[in-house]
Amino acid sequence: MYDDYLTIALSKGTLLEPTLEVFKKLKLPGEGINDKSRSMVFTYDNERVKYIMCRPTDVPTYVEQGAADLGIVGKDVIVEQARDVFEMVDLQYGYCRFVVAVPEAIKNITLKDLNYKRAATKFPVIAENFFRSQGLQVEIIKLHGNIELAPLMGLADMIVDLVSTGRTLKENRLVELIKIMDSTTRLICNRVSYRTKHQQIQPLIENMQKLSTGGSA
């Protein structure tokens, strides 16, 4: 049965508040949504819009599988997962960067000195692709949190991680060696939904593009 609601997967956490600010400017509904709510689905019948609250790493899966028509998620997650979705708009917020960071004690090493070393990361695909592109053989150690601990405990020689202010690196006596890529928040779209709900989706895309380039929706 065809569902005429536009379903949007929202990333919980730091991206939620700026996303709701964008929706407010676009005159999209958002009453009652906050990161502390236990509700996972918010439905607005008058506007025919439905939001689902997801962990950021789950957003591309919901969109790819058609459980959501659209999703709001960081570029880092998109690149790491390589899901079969359309990337529609760079929303220009939630900026951070992927970096290779090493202990302060070896801050003067060069990129080629990383050959045959070990890198801890939550993003093994991005890390492996980067080192391979540089012609380096690096052992990737996947962790799920506290990446900065790995060099301190001798588990890894370096880390590959997302950085915004750099404060966490400094607190753990790590320094940025090289930037791999920038990451900002993106609007992604299910491939089938883009065709079947084009009349609902395309105006939203165009208005988001206007906002992201400094215009008004």
From Swiss-Prot:
> If you read the UniProt record, what top EC class would you report for this enzyme, in one word?
transferase
* Gene Ontology process terms (BP): L-histidine biosynthetic process
Q: In which pathway does it act?
A: Amino-acid biosynthesis; L-histidine biosynthesis; L-histidine from 5-phospho-alpha-D-ribose 1-diphosphate: step 1/9
In which compartments does the protein localize? Cytoplasm
Its predominant location is cytoplasm
Keywords, alphabetical: Amino-acid biosynthesis, ATP-binding, Cytoplasm, Glycosyltransferase, Histidine biosynthesis, Nucleotide-binding, Transferase
What are the GO cellular component annotations?
cytoplasm
One Gene Ontology molecular-function label: ATP phosphoribosyltransferase activity
Coiled-coil blocks: none
Q: What InterPro entries does this protein's entry cite?
A: ATP_PRibTrfase_cat, ATP_PRibTrfase_CS, ATP_PRibTrfase_HisG, ATP_PRibTrfase_HisG_short
For this chain, the annotated S-S bridges are none
Which Enzyme Commission number(s) are listed? 2.4.2.17
Q: Does the keyword Cytoplasm apply?
A: yes
Catalytic activity reads: 1-(5-phospho-beta-D-ribosyl)-ATP + diphosphate = 5-phospho-alpha-D-ribose 1-diphosphate + ATP
Q: Which domain of life is it from?
A: Bacteria
Question: Can you tell me which family this protein belongs to?
Answer: Belongs to the ATP phosphoribosyltransferase family. Short subfamily.
Q: How does it assemble?
A: Heteromultimer composed of HisG and HisZ subunits.
The task this protein performs is described as:
Catalyzes the condensation of ATP and 5-phosphoribose 1-diphosphate to form N'-(5'-phosphoribosyl)-ATP (PR-ATP). Has a crucial role in the pathway because the rate of histidine biosynthesis seems to be controlled primarily by regulation of HisG enzymatic activity.
The record's note on its domains: Lacks the C-terminal regulatory region which is replaced by HisZ.
Q: Which HAMAP family match?
A: HisG_Short
Query: What protein is this chain from?
Result: ATP phosphoribosyltransferase
Which species is listed as the source? Answer: Syntrophomonas wolfei subsp. wolfei (strain DSM 2245B / Goettingen)
